[in-house]
Amino acid sequence: MHRLTLAQIARGLAAKEFSSVELSEALLARIAELDPGLNSFITVTAEQALEQARAADARRAAGESGALLGAPIAHKDLFCTKGVRTSCASKILDDFIAPYDATVVERLAAAGCVSLGKLNMDEFAMGSASESSHYGPVRNPWNTECVPGGSSGGSAAAVAARLVPAATGSDTGGSIRQPAALTNLTGLKPTYGRVSRWGMIAYASSLDQGGPLARSAEDCALLLSAMAGFDPKDSTCVDQPVDDYLAALHRPLAGLRIGLPREYFGAGLDPRLSDAVMACVEELKKLGATVKEIGLPSMQHAIPAYYVIAPAEASSNLSRFDGVRFGYRCENPQSLEDLYKRSRGEGFGAEVKRRIMVGTYALSAGYYDAYYLKAQKIRRLIRSDFIGAFQEVDLILGPTTPNPAWKLGEKGDDPVAAYLEDIYTITANLAGIPGLSMPAGFVDGLPVGVQLLAPYFQESRLLNVAHQYQQATDWHQRAPEGY
């Protein structure tokens, strides 16, 4: 049963080939057996999951139907889950039990999803390797000596290892798409404002967006159908009609105009990965697409701009973790200042502290104009580049990452080397457009992904192209050995 995709599970449950309880029990046994070697889960909610599965089976028996009714999933551990620890993979929130469900959690539960637990990640979603977690690094099931990507690495590893058919993630600079690429999954970052951020613990509020990781575009469409939509509790959530993502999957690609940005194929890209991207392009041409080269000139400034804006917002967002209201509190503080200093100093990990300091510096009076204001101007230029490009093409295609997965600890001493792994993904967050990564082959036995970018609220187009490509290829069906 663990080999079934979300869509196959939906069909199996509807045909009464198995029950949600049977499926959940099988996956929980698999998590207990295999996850110690991967460390993808922080919290497994076995009792709650079986309770939800029994309720889903009862709803089906009473005549209710629904594609996700009784389907198992798991949540990245920055989505608040009522009565269950929500840690953000940080010592500072190690004992935080959320008093409410995030909107994403609430909507998937209403659709009948069974949550098997909370997934490991980079601390406060800051990282590209899932190595900075207070609970230890996550391992990539394709090679357990390698990272699974980040920050949604636990989500990616758990789905790739068939511990759970699909998972939620969040994407601030590539944190859904990059781990999806490194673990042979399909990962979607929706348009900023398409999915509610209410109850999703913030890293950088103008960049964060929740989305699905799954084994196919069809599975992502199923999840996004339940997750998307206006939420009055989130002031950044856009009141825009939700497309029929499942119906859109089957559109032919004849006449689709694809743009290849010349800036994506320069120095720093593994040439074997470039070959995989071009093979994908040839496949899409066979399906009726046309391809042309385009320019995104401001992309060269994206990483410096992102690493000013994101830490600046993080320094503000993370100021709430002060040892007073909730979360970790140091022992025997000598004064209020000592309480703040020691609670934060002992509670946050090295990468989080690094980004808080960078962000505070960028926002300080003497440097605000030189750094933060300039970064926001670059952000506007990047957005203008995309708006211009989408007047010429329907979709932009390129590599998701410059390299396949690297070894655990390899980039630990060089934060900038890790930051450069996000070079192709962060522009979508800065512009707010949707992006999807899909499996496109292997380099040295490790998966690589192709990224698709579309205009605002065109998630259905991304899912359509990915689904048609997945009908013509079988990369996405390949599983890591032993899983």
Swiss-Prot record:
EC number, as in UniProt: 6.3.5.7
Catalytic activity, reaction form: L-glutamyl-tRNA(Gln) + L-glutamine + ATP + H2O = L-glutaminyl-tRNA(Gln) + L-glutamate + ADP + phosphate + H(+)
Entry annotation: catalytic residues: 76 (charge relay system), 151 (charge relay system), 175 (acyl-ester intermediate)
One Pfam family of this chain: Amidase
Family annotation (PROSITE patterns): AMIDASES
GO aspect biological process, one term: translation
Enzyme class: ligase
GO annotation, cellular component aspect: glutamyl-tRNA(Gln) amidotransferase complex
Superkingdom of the source species: Bacteria
GO molecular function: ATP binding; glutaminyl-tRNA synthase (glutamine-hydrolyzing) activity
Keywords of this entry: ATP-binding, Ligase, Nucleotide-binding, Protein biosynthesis
Task of the protein: Allows the formation of correctly charged Gln-tRNA(Gln) through the transamidation of misacylated Glu-tRNA(Gln) in organisms which lack glutaminyl-tRNA synthetase. The reaction takes place in the presence of glutamine and ATP through an activated gamma-phospho-Glu-tRNA(Gln).
Quaternary organization: Heterotrimer of A, B and C subunits.
Family (UniProt): Belongs to the amidase family. GatA subfamily.
Protein name: Glutamyl-tRNA(Gln) amidotransferase subunit A
Organism: Azotobacter vinelandii (strain DJ / ATCC BAA-1303)
Gene from which this protein is expressed: gatA
